[in-house]
Each structure stands twice: as C-alpha cells, then as structure tokens.
Amino acid sequence: MQVLIFDDKKAVAENAATLLQKLILAKNNANIGLATGSTPIDLYKQLVSMYKNKHISFAQVNTFNLDEYYDIDENNSNSYRYFMNSQLFDHIDIDKNNTHLPTCNAKQDPRKQGEHFEQQIAALGGLDLQLLGIGGNGHIGFNEPSSSFASRTRIKSLTEQTVSDNSRMFSDDEQQPKMAMTMGIATIMDAKYVLLIATGKNKAQAVNDMVNGPLSASCPASILQMHKNAIVIIDNDAASLLANKDYFTWVSQQNHEINQAFGHFPDL
C-alpha cells in the first residue's frame, strides 16, 4: 500500500487527478470505477479543467460507479447518476452510454441487477482502477462494517447513521431511500489498481484503522492492505492519527522517484 500525504485537500485532488490523467494517457479506453460524495468533487473539478485545457480525453473511457440508491429516478437531484452528470459527465467528452451505475428499481430483481453489473464489468476486461472514498466508520461504497470481504454487487440496507448523514440532502416531504445497490468488496478488490482519497480530521481514525489494521470486517477498508496496487492519497488532517505517519512521509519521495522513472501503472 502506497500512502501519500499532502498538505491539504486541494493538493490531494490535484495529485489524484494527475494519477487518473496518467492512467488514461497510458490506456485511452481505461475502465475506471468512480465514487460519489463530497470528497471526490474537487478531483472531478480538476479532471474537467484538464479536459477543457486539452490535456485529457474521456472519449473512449468506460466508467462504473460504486453505488446508487435503490429505486430512485436518475433525474432526482439526489441520485448518484445526477451527481455524476452534474459534477463530471456533462462537462467532458465521455459517451454516457459508456457510463454505468448499479441501478435497480422496485420492479427488478436486485440479485439479477447485481449480476448484470458484474457481467458488464467483466465483459470489458475488468476495472483498471477503482476510485474510493472512506467513511468515518471505514466503509467503502455502501459496504458498511460487517460486510463480507467476498461480497459482490448487491442490494444493501443502509445503516441508521448513513441514513442520518444523508438526510440533509432530502426534503421533508421526500421519501429517503433506506437501501442502495453497491459494488461488493470482492468487486473492488478485483480492480487492477485502487485509489483511495481522504481529507479531514473526521476521517483520521478510519484511515489509521485501514492502514495499520487489524484486517477486520469492522473496518471494511482494511481489506486494502491485501491489494497489490493500493494507493492512498490523504491530507495532513486525515493522516493526523496515522501511527507511522513519519515513515510514510519519508518514503513518499522514494515512491515518487520510482513512479516517475518506471511509470505509475505497470500492471495495465
């Protein structure tokens, strides 16, 4: 696991965007898993800027999002399809037919929808990189604590805390989803590369639990210790409880030199 620590969230977004740019330049038809939430917004702004300045093209890129609320209209401003369109897809040259979310409505069998999403990923050769955030309790996607490390794309009931955290996004007269479709932990682990970004002191404990263990379903993100190509980009606040922060700070420069000399993505 490479842990790269930067001064602030702006530097996190810039460096994460640069990595994604290098990935797409190395493989213009890359299959990239994307995330929603507040953490990647600045990253997406950086990617839009790169596109507008003709430093990158998404014309042949395929994307697969981590999750989507169950039985939500894609035009609902709280759907993750709406989020991705407004934050990224509407502002770049991506073909929206090549953008995928794990959707399921009340008339569809969630098990079959999950299998279909897995088949879509497999048909394109698997994910080259999966972008992740991390919840305060260590969740990735909607894989909350106690989620199976062997899980695949499926429907999940949201925890009371997650429902509470997200309630500010829904109006009083709007029915808030209590379930969501999410990639499973095994689906995430199948990606050739995983890029997790985190900022803020509210993520510091989860970051330390992820990096330093123990490996436990109590912190779903701790499974990334077992990933061959996990890259973690965090700011100083998110690194503030990292037990071995000085070590990771020291080795960052060595990792940077190796990556510059031999490339960031040798396993593509």
From Swiss-Prot:
HAMAP family: GlcN6P_deamin. The active site is at 67 (proton acceptor), 137 (for ring-opening step), 139 (proton acceptor), 144 (for ring-opening step). GO terms for molecular function: glucosamine-6-phosphate deaminase activity; identical protein binding. The keyword Cytoplasm does not apply. Keywords: Carbohydrate metabolism, Hydrolase. Homohexamer. Its EC number is 3.5.99.6. Belongs to the glucosamine/galactosamine-6-phosphate isomerase family. NagB subfamily. It holds the Pfam family Glucosamine_iso. GO terms for biological process: carbohydrate metabolic process; glucosamine catabolic process; N-acetylglucosamine catabolic process; N-acetylneuraminate catabolic process. It catalyses: alpha-D-glucosamine 6-phosphate + H2O = beta-D-fructose 6-phosphate + NH4(+). Pathway: Amino-sugar metabolism; N-acetylneuraminate degradation; D-fructose 6-phosphate from N-acetylneuraminate: step 5/5. This is Glucosamine-6-phosphate deaminase. It comes from Pseudoalteromonas translucida (strain TAC 125). InterPro entries: Glc/Gal-6P_isomerase (IPR006148), Glucosamine6P_isomerase (IPR004547), Glucosamine6P_isomerase_CS (IPR018321), NagB/RpiA_transferase-like (IPR037171). Catalyzes the reversible isomerization-deamination of glucosamine 6-phosphate (GlcN6P) to form fructose 6-phosphate (Fru6P) and ammonium ion. One of its GO terms (cellular component) is cytoplasm. SUPFAM superfamilies: NagB/RpiA/CoA transferase-like.
